[in-house]
Design a protein with these regions (language model features):
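Low-complexity, Lys/Gly-biased intrinsically disordered segments
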Residues: 1-6, 17-24, 154-200, 211-212
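A short beta-sheet element
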Residues: 4-65, 78, 188-190, 198-270
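Extended, charge-rich, solvent-exposed interface segments
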Residues: 81-82
Length: 270
């Protein structure tokens, strides 16, 4: 690892060093540059480059593992909301590293799993697109009803169809989470940030990003469909349906609703 942090090339792993990006899992292996091309960027990440005799894929999986992530998160210093990883702490970590053959064997197994996850994600995305198309056709474009709202329907407000559970949210700092067993997912605004040994919710819920990264590039809200036992910090709205509206229906509704016009804030979007 080196702290200059603004240059990278194919094979390097880049890890966010500022909160909440690191907790949100912002780490990637670079593979989009041309041969010999060098990338430049922000100083808000750390670049990891495999030394000779080490496997770049193994380095990536090592950096994304708790072995590196957890000490990095615990080392964060700075004002609230702008805390950064201390690169010297990361550089000083002692880790067990197998020989090159062992590294390649480990990385190969993990890559196969990643490829399967990516394939499943594509299937899910395709199914979601089909569901969105059906929902839009019936409830937005009203095609089955010749474009007219049926007489027994009415225009209402979101409050008529959702229950908000935000009052039950309890944020846990990275230091508080560091010593907890990794059992239940701990959600942030956009993704699983960590795992903890306790939970606040049990069931099927819709999480809608409240601040930070709240919309995608087209202005649609960042949503997470979650099921089971989990914990949520205070950066996501926690939603269930009422009056006959399921969480699945709400997901489709919000995923097709552009909210850019109601997003506020210059630096911290909300």
């Amino acid at each position: 690892a080196f702290s200059g942090g603004t240059k990278f090339r194919n094979g390097d792993t880049i890890m966010a060093r500022i909160t909440p990006c690191l907790e949100n899992g912002k780490t990637a292996k670079v593979d989009v540059l041309d041969e010999e091309e060098v990338g430049f960027g922000s100083t808000e990440y750390i670049v990891f480059r495999a030394k000779e005799g080490n496997d770049p894929d193994f380095i990536y999986y090592l950096v994304t593992s708790p072995v590196v992530r957890e000490p990095a998160i615990k080392s964060m210093v700075g004002s609230s909301g702008r805390q950064r990883v201390q690169t010297d702490v990361v550089q000083g970590l002692k880790v067990r590293v197998p020989d090159l053959e062992g590294q390649q064997a480990i990385a190969s197994v993990l890559k196969v799993l990643d490829d399967k996850i990516a394939a499943n994600r594509k299937v899910n995305e395709n199914l979601l697109q089909q569901a969105q198309a059906l929902y839009k056709d019936r409830f937005v474009d009203l095609n089955p009803f010749d474009g007219e709202i049926p007489m027994d329907w009415h225009l209402g407000t979101v409050s008529e169809i959702i229950e908000l559970h935000d009052s039950k949210r309890i944020p846990l700092s990275s230091r508080e989470r560091a010593n907890l067993a990794k059992i239940y997912p701990y959600y942030g605004a956009t993704s699983v940030m960590d795992y903890v040994d306790r939970y606040l919710f049990d069931g099927i819920y819709l999480l809608l990003a409240e601040d930070g990264t709240v919309v995608d590039s087209k202005g649609f809200p960042i949503l997470q469909y979650v099921e089971g036992k989990f914990w949520v910090n205070n950066h996501a709205h926690i939603i269930t349906g009422k009056n006959g509206f399921t969480v699945e229906t709400l997901y489709l509704l919000f995923s097709l609703t552009n909210v850019q016009s109601i997003v506020t804030g210059a630096v911290q979007l909300k």
